[in-house]
Regions:
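Structural motif corresponding to the intra-repeat A-B loop/turn of tetratricopeptide repeats
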Residues: 79, 110-113, 161, 201, ...
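DNA major-groove recognition helix of helix-turn-helix/homeodomain DNA-binding modules
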Residues: 43-60
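A short, Lys/Arg-rich alpha-helix, primarily the initiator
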Residues: 1-14
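Amphipathic alpha-helical segments of tetratricopeptide repeats
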Residues: 90-95, 172-183, 212-222, 248-256, ...
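Short alpha-helical DNA-recognition segment
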Residues: 15-34
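Residue signature of alpha-solenoid helical repeat architecture, marking inter-repeat boundaries
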Residues: 63, 97-103, 108, 125, ...
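Residue register of alpha-helical TPR repeats
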Residues: 105, 149, 189, 229, ...
Length: 373
């Protein structure tokens, strides 16, 4: 289907105009019907007149502007330079190009949610691949457009779903393809998620191997956010594997810790006998905002640590168990699997203390098949 035919139809219907009213003096009703349904390719003059009657701007200068913006946007997206892409699209008013076919490119490049399905017949393969990613159909996007970007998106989706073996395969493919294309940002992102996947499997040697490469890339790109993420995830893995003093050294050394970093610091202090420092970290965290996860859920996680610190007999208290299990269910249902995996030891501890051994086994078998036993 022709995009401009579609937009003429949509705008005419929105205004509640008849076909006869729109095309009067321009073309016949039957010809307009064919244009709207994509069965006819009208001349530039007829298109211009129909669009002008609908107050939709189009001329060669507008088309050139839109094409240049879209070309630059695709280059930035497919090489992982999302910050620059956001800046590029903020500078231009894409609605100005609504009557130009390239509007589809600009809309997809700036979209956070899928475009309406009725537009899909107007899309080319590249546009449709991005539409599928927005629809969370990443495997279909890879089939349509197998490149570093789509493999990265598939790997991230598999990672978030807890399918770590599949994630590793897709992310490694993304890294290799990005290396061939010189897409350094995609290489970095692939390495970060590869490290994350091995982190959640508590495979520290492979985690450190991927993070080591990721750290080099982040240093070369001067990406402080990526460096902090590597440090945070590595130290979190140390907590999961009982290396509390090493984790404490990292979390206590952060000059501007986030709420979740203070949560981890409090756990390190809890595990190493630094009770007062743990309580101070929790108090500080409770006053902070957070973008990473829902703040109410984050406060519940802080409350769990505080409860253990203030009630040494927490394993005998039903209200602790209720808070723990409810929070754990929210982590499983609302966030990437790594959050639940991190808190799994406390759930297993609770089940063991309350002699619910069957539930402990079922939890591991049903929800965490890749968790080392």
């Amino acid at each position: 289907m022709n995009y401009q035919g579609y937009i003429i139809y949509r705008e005419r219907v929105r205004r509640n105009w008849s076909q006869a009213g729109l095309c009067k003096g321009i073309c016949t009703v039957s010809y307009l019907s064919k244009i709207e349904s994509g069965r006819a390719e009208p001349s530039e003059e007829i298109l211009r007149l129909l669009l002008a009657r609908l107050n939709l701007e189009t001329n060669r200068e507008v088309e050139r502007e839109a094409a240049g913006l879209a070309e630059r946007g695709w280059e930035l997206l497919l090489t992982g330079r999302r910050g620059q892409l956001r800046g590029l699209l903020r500078e231009g008013d894409i609605e100005r190009y609504r009557a130009v076919p390239t509007w589809l490119d600009l809309a997809l490049l700036s979209a956070q949610t899928p475009l309406e399905p009725a537009l899909e017949p107007c899309m080319d393969v590249r546009q449709l691949a991005v539409q599928r990613i927005l629809q969370r159909q990443e495997a279909e996007a890879v089939r349509l457009m197998p490149n570093a970007y789509t493999h990265l998106m598939l790997g991230i989706a598999d990672y978030n779903a807890g399918s770590y073996s599949a994630a590793v395969d897709a992310l490694q493919t993304a890294y290799d393809l990005a290396g061939r294309e010189g897409a350094v940002r995609l290489m970095l992102e692939a390495k970060l998620f590869l490290g994350n996947a091995y982190c959640n499997r508590q495979d520290l040697p492979n985690m450190e191997r991927h993070y080591r490469v990721g750290r080099r890339l982040a240093e070369d790109l001067q990406d402080e956010s990526a460096l902090r993420a590597i440090g945070y995830n590595t130290a979190s893995a140390w907590i999961e594997t009982g290396r509390y003093e090493e984790a404490y050294a990292w979390f206590s050394g952060q000059e501007q810790p986030t709420l979740m970093a203070l949560h981890k610091l409090a756990i390190c202090c809890e595990k190493t006998g630094r009770r007062e420092e743990a309580l101070r970290a929790l108090t500080r965290a409770e006053a902070m905002d957070i973008d990473e996860i829902d703040r109410a859920l984050a406060l519940r996680l802080l409350q769990l640590v505080r409860y253990r610190l203030e009630h040494p007999d927490y394993l005998t208290r039903d209200d602790y168990g209720a808070l723990l299990l409810d929070s754990f269910d929210r982590l499983r249902n609302e966030l990437p699997l790594g959050y639940a995996l991190f808190h799994l030891p406390w759930v297993l501890e609770w089940y063991k203390a309350t002699r619910q051994y069957k539930k402990a086994c079922e939890l591991l078998e049903a929800y965490f098949p890749e968790k080392p036993l």
